[in-house]
């Protein structure tokens, strides 16, 4: 069942705003939600057909809520339901909607996405799932109530970089680490894991870091990502300045909570910008994220450029600059193991969906198998 319109959106704009927007340009009313000259130009052909622009703020089965120049409306998505799960209507999408008069009103098309968050699902059908669209900042929320899982942070970072958004790691519940020295060590650990990414300790209880975070999200669209119990809903309420999202306690033993947020909602921030809150992600499977993985492990990619062989896999090859860095202590072995793990996982996902890649992997396996057999025969003196 579709939910009712939620708090955080006006049911209608002022008559002067709506009138100006509908007669001239919708940008006046929708600018707070991210509408700009680029979207205006992209939408122009649809405006000529009498359609109206709107941004998807929540998706239900077969329907979605959109904010438009008329305010918040509900529309049917039957015309934009493709077989590809990565192309379905998603929170953050910009859409062309039928004008007032239709009952129900229909979404006729989606504008091309600038950025898109996708992960692999846990199903056996090797499908991707779209989490949010047209996002500028990815706020990866990590709770300090439990031990840091650096590998999980790397997964979220790979997903964020691959989407095209700028990641930011927020260490929530910073008040639970009262020792400044201990907190700085934790920040340094995450900074080492997240090169080129700002790491910000934040406490909704004390207000630490809230002003800095508010400044980051005040422009553009931000999405909150994190595991269940990471404190995303509490953080969302802090940024929104009111208790819009329900908050539930996390288990003390592992910091995991029940899903407070069950749908992806787009909400207007009081200081400017919009926020998409997502349900806690128990599974963070990669989806065609080779570029994102490379960005997360940029120091390894840099070292790889100095390897003797261009196809070095950084295991036992002679002249490998990456393994040499591990032996010298310049590169933590955990980083290399995590890098290998994510690359293998991503390759498996790509192979399941790309016949050409499957053929290349099979060919590589056969080549390595033949080389291994030749080496064994040479060792046993069977080659004449």
Locate predicted features.
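Canonical P-loop GTPase G-domain recognition
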Residues: 176-230
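Helix-rich effector regions associated with P-loop NTPase G domains
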Residues: 2-33, 46-50, 84-101, 111-131, ...
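A conserved segment at the C-terminal end of the G1
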Residues: 232-248
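Structural detector for short beta-strands of small beta-barrel domains
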Residues: 50-60
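Phosphate-binding glycine-rich loops and their immediate beta-loop-alpha structural context
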Residues: 129-134, 140-193
């Amino acid at each position: 069942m579709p939910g009712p319109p939620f708090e955080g959106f006006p049911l209608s704009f002022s008559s002067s705003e709506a009138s100006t927007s509908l007669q001239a340009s919708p940008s006046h009313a929708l600018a707070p939600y991210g509408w700009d000259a680029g979207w205006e130009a992209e939408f122009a052909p649809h405006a000529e057909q009498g359609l109206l622009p709107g941004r998807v703020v929540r998706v239900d089965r077969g329907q979605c809520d959109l904010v438009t120049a008329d305010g918040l409306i509900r529309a049917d998505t039957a015309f934009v339901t493709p077989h590809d799960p990565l192309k379905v209507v998603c929170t953050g999408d910009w859409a062309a909607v039928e004008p007032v008069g239709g009952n129900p009103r229909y979404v006729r098309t989606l504008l091309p996405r600038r950025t898109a968050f996708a992960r692999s699902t846990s199903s056996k059908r090797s499908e991707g799932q779209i989490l949010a669209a047209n996002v500028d900042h990815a706020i990866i929320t990590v709770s300090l109530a439990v031990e840091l899982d650096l590998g999980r942070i790397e997964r979220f970072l790979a997903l964020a970089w691959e989407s095209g958004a700028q990641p930011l790691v927020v260490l929530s519940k910073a008040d639970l680490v009262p020792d400044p020295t201990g907190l700085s060590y934790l920040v340094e650990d995450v900074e080492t894991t997240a090169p080129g990414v700002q790491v910000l300790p934040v406490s909704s209880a004390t207000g630490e870091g809230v002003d800095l975070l508010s400044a980051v999200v005040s422009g553009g669209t931000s999405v909150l990502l994190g595991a269940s119990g990471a404190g995303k809903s509490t953080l969302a309420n802090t940024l929104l300045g009111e208790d819009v999202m329900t908050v539930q306690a996390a288990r003390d033993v592992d910091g995991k909570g029940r899903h407070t947020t069950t749908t992806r909602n787009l909400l207007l921030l009081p200081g400017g910008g919009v926020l998409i809150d997502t349900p806690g992600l128990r599974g963070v499977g990669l989806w065609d994220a080779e570029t994102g993985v490379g960005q997360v492990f940029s120091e390894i990619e840099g070292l790889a450029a100095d390897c003797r062989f261009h196809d070095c896999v950084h295991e036992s090859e002679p002249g490998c600059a990456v393994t040499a860095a591990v032996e010298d202590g310049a590169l933590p072995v955990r980083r290399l193991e995590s890098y290998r793990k994510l690359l293998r996982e991503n390759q498996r996902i790509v192979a399941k969906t790309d016949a050409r890649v499957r053929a290349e992997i099979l060919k590589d396996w056969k080549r390595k198998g033949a080389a291994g057999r030749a080496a064994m025969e040479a060792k046993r003196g069977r080659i004449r």
